[in-house]
A protein has these predicted regions:
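Hydrophobic alpha-helical transmembrane segments
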Residues: 66-79, 195
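Extended serine/threonine-enriched, polar tracts that run as long, contiguous segments within proteins
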Residues: 181-188, 192-195, 199-238
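Helical mechanochemical/support elements of P-loop NTPase systems and associated helical scaffolds
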Residues: 77, 115, 119, 185, ...
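Gly/Ser-rich, low-complexity
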Residues: 1-72, 88-97, 107-176, 215-220, ...
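Elongated alpha-helical scaffolds
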Residues: 102-105
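Alpha-helical transmembrane segments of multipass membrane proteins
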Residues: 81, 178, 203-207, 240, ...
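Transmembrane alpha-helical segments of multi-pass small-molecule transport proteins
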Residues: 74-81, 172, 199-203
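Membrane-water interface regions at transmembrane-helix termini and the short interhelical loops
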Residues: 81-94, 181-185, 213-214
Length: 286
């Protein structure tokens, strides 16, 4: 009779132990996968991320937005020419050299407008090179390993009630980690959608960049491009810090490790949310 109880006890203990080990292993494997996916996504240019979306955005910009930008550029240049004439006492003191300056400015403005996507992609190419260079330095810090031998020894020392509580905790935290991962997924991919939306209207702010009064629109737009591009670098730094903290938090017991992993994942989510506003503040972008 007592042998039957012992058998049931061992069976329950083995069931909980295997489930806890599986949850624990999956959780940290999920952490490694999530970190690797983030590092891969933020290092992609708009073309590398999805060439089909990029080509669609470029086609829309060139066929729909550039004609509007051309009208804006014409208005801006005509307005500047009229202003140039009037401020010189209705051409009574007008210097013919100003016409050549205006023609040069017009040439530069038209060149910038017709090469909008080349300039825009150059910004993200620079940002990508920075992200890739940083990835080469911190990639070795992105793995969190699980010592299954120590974990099994620790679980063997627990009672059935303690194992049940730990099993319940591991399942709850596993669900929480998946919810946090979904939010992180939305942030990373939402950034790329924001980039596509931003570059789709690039010709309009670029059409104002050579004008003294309207140039602030183009300058602010360039700042926002650099902010979006270099946000990837800040995300890489956040991920590297997160991975190091995850690895160093695994020295205690399993409960501490589980809650630390969940708390640090929530912290990563918060820092990723802040990375966009921080980068805009650095580049003074509105």
């Amino acid at each position: 009779m007592f042998g039957l109880f012992d058998f049931i006890d061992e069976w329950i203990r083995a069931l909980f132990t295997d489930s806890i080990v599986s949850n624990y292993t999956k959780m940290f494997a999920h952490v490694n996968d999530e970190v690797g996916n983030i590092a891969a996504q933020v290092g992609a240019t708009p073309f590398d991320y999805n060439s089909e979306i990029y080509n669609m955005i470029r086609a829309l910009s060139e066929t729909v937005i550039i004609p509007i930008a051309g009208m804006i550029l014409t208005f801006v240049l005509c307005y500047e020419l009229i202003q140039m004439i009037l401020e010189k006492n209705n051409m009574a003191e007008f210097d013919i050299a100003n016409i050549y300056k205006w023609m040069m400015k017009t040439f530069i403005a038209v060149y910038v407008l017709t090469h909008t996507f080349d300039i825009t992609m150059a910004v993200f190419d620079v940002a990508q090179s920075v992200v890739n260079a940083s990835a080469g330095i911190i990639s070795g810090s992105l793995d969190a390993d699980v010592d299954l031998a120590d974990l099994a020894d620790y679980l063997d020392s627990l009672t059935v009630g303690e194992l049940f509580g730990l099993w319940l905790e591991s399942n709850i935290l596993g669900l929480a980690m998946r919810a946090i991962s979904l939010c992180i997924f939305l942030i990373i991919h939402g950034r790329m959608i924001e980039i596509y939306l931003t570059i789709s209207v690039a010709p309009i702010p670029f059409s104002t960049i050579v004008n003294r009064e309207w140039g602030s629109i183009g300058n602010s737009y360039l700042k926002s491009l650099f902010a979006l591009g270099f946000q990837g670098f800040l995300i890489m730094v956040c991920v590297a810090i997160y991975a190091v903290l995850i690895r160093t938090s695994m020295g205690g017991d399993i409960q501490t490790s589980l809650w630390s992993a969940a708390g640090l994942s929530l912290l990563l989510l918060m820092t990723l949310f802040k990375s966009g506003s921080l980068c805009k503040a650095i580049f003074n972008s509105n």
